[in-house]
């Protein structure tokens, strides 16, 4: 079924307020979740609300966080987030990074002790809309076997990039360092769909197409994805003095406790390196040139990275956002959550 962006936003905001989140924070979380669903990233959209509601109600997301911004240098800062909702902390951290890059050319802002922040391309697009290049990366729960390994160590550790072209054009790239994000498995479960056998393995280490049999995810491109998830764990965890590797808290372990996750934003002001106008012209030229490339057999069009999601977002603004009926029924119900996510086992979800 499809519903309007405004309706979905209000339903999510109301449910999070029902769980105990203050209206201002609930609106920010809803904004990021609706953004994800509008772009077809359903793994990070409304499917997450029930889990968030349970964690908020149990105190694992701080309903009254005391944020503290520590400016550690002219271009660097740490936002101590007090286990606030991740979307709220990440948006706040990016706002400070943008102000710093405006004045000093570059900014690096670490966000310390936060909750799950969702689709992190939202935050790099904040920077792009301000005319800057945005890069963001964050930790996630351990659920990935390292290349050549049989035991879980790292999380899906996503990485996102966005840069402004001419007008309102934005080039956006957002990826998990696994073949697919864990949320894609959750989305497949909610839709009763199978998954490709390249995404994950079962408890015996055998590739599986059954999303309910998943025991661990696989790194993207083998050793390359493995290396990237290591880098992100170092920059968003080790660098900030936070838990790292398999020490990172599980999303489903103790919903009464804060996640203590880390995220790192990097913002670059093109004016300090060439000129903003020239940069934007060349970026739009890149996008046009990629679109003009002759497609390979089996393809109708060459897209620049993120273009397929841009198209979905524009379409959703006109036609509404696709949402699974079970999720819609939950959002309009009085229930805070139907089944507890506190299983201590992410693969039981």
Swiss-Prot record:
Q: How does it assemble?
A: Homodimer.
Q: Report what the protein is called.
A: Ureidoglycolate dehydrogenase (NAD(+))
What family does this belong to? Answer: Belongs to the LDH2/MDH2 oxidoreductase family.
**GO MF annotation terms:** ureidoglycolate dehydrogenase activity
- UniProt entry keywords in alphabetical sequence: Cytoplasm, NAD, Oxidoreductase, Purine metabolism
Q: What is its EC number?
A: 1.1.1.350
An example Pfam family from this entry, by short name, is Ldh_2
Active-site residues per Swiss-Prot or TrEMBL entry: 116
GO terms for cellular component: cytoplasm
SUPFAM superfamilies found in the cross-reference section: L-sulfolactate dehydrogenase-like
The places in or outside the cell where this protein is found are: Cytoplasm
Q: What is the effect of changing residue 44 to A?
A: 16-fold decrease of the affinity for (S)-ureidoglycolate, but same affinity for NAD compared to the wild-type. Strong decrease of the catalytic efficiency
Pathway in which this enzyme or protein is active: Nitrogen metabolism; (S)-allantoin degradation; oxalurate from (S)-ureidoglycolate: step 1/1
> What does the function comment of this entry state?
AllD plays a pivotal role as a metabolic branch-point enzyme in nitrogen utilization via the assimilation of allantoin. It is able to utilize allantoin as a sole source of nitrogen under anaerobic conditions. Catalyzes the oxidation of ureidoglycolate to oxalurate.
Organism superkingdom:
Bacteria
- For whether the record's keyword set contains Oxidoreductase, the answer is yes
Induction and repression of expression: By glyoxylate and allantoin under anaerobic conditions.
- The residues annotated as site (Plays a crucial role in stabilizing the binding of (S)-ureidoglycolate) are 48
Q: Which reaction does it catalyse?
A: (S)-ureidoglycolate + NAD(+) = N-carbamoyl-2-oxoglycine + NADH + H(+)
In the record, biological process GO terms are:
allantoin assimilation pathway; purine nucleobase metabolic process
Positions annotated to bind NAD(+): 140, 174-176, 224, 306-308
Q: Which InterPro entries match?
A: Mal/L-sulf/L-lact_DH-like_ah (IPR043144), Mal/L-sulf/L-lact_DH-like_NADP (IPR043143), Mal/L-sulfo/L-lacto_DH-like_sf (IPR036111), Malate/L-lactate_DH-like (IPR003767), Ureidoglycolate_dehydrogenase (IPR017590)
């Amino acid at each position: 079924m499809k519903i309007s962006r405004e309706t979905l936003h209000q339903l999510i905001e109301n449910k999070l307020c029902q769980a105990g989140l203050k209206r201002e924070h609930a609106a920010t979380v809803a904004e990021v979740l609706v953004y994800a669903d509008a772009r077809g990233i359903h793994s990070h959209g409304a499917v997450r609300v029930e889990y968030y509601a349970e964690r908020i109600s149990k105190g694992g997301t701080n309903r009254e966080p005391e944020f503290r911004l520590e400016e550690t240098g002219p271009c660097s800062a740490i936002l101590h987030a007090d286990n606030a909702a991740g979307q709220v902390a990440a948006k706040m951290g990016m706002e400070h990074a943008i102000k710093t890059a405006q004045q000093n050319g570059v900014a690096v802002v670490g966000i310390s002790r936060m909750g799950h922040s969702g689709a992190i391309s939202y935050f790099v697009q904040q920077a792009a809309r301000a005319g800057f290049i945005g890069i963001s990366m964050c930790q996630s729960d351990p659920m990935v076997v390292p290349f050549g390994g049989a035991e879980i160590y790292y999380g899906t550790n996503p990485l996102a990039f966005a840069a402004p072209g001419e007008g309102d054009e934005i080039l956006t790239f957002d990826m998990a360092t696994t073949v697919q994000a864990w949320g894609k498995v959750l989305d497949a479960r909610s839709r009763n769909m199978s998954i490709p056998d390249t995404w994950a393995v079962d408890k015996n280490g055998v590739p599986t197409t059954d999303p309910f049999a998943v025991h661990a995810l696989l790194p993207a491109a083998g050793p390359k994805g493995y290396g990237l998830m290591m880098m992100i764990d170092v920059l968003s965890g080790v660098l900030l003095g936070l838990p790292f590797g398999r020490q990172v808290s599980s999303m489903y372990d103790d919903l009464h406790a804060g996640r203590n996750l880390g995220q790192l934003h990097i913002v670059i002001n093109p004016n300090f390196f060439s000129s903003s106008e020239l940069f934007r012209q060349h970026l739009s030229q890149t996008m046009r040139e990629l679109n003009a490339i002759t497609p390979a057999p089996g393809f109708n069009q060459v897209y620049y990275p993120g273009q397929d999601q841009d198209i979905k977002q524009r379409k959703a603004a006109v036609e509404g956002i696709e949402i699974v009926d079970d999720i819609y029924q939950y959002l309009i119900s009085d229930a805070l959550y139907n089944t507890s996510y506190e299983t201590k086992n992410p693969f039981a979800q």
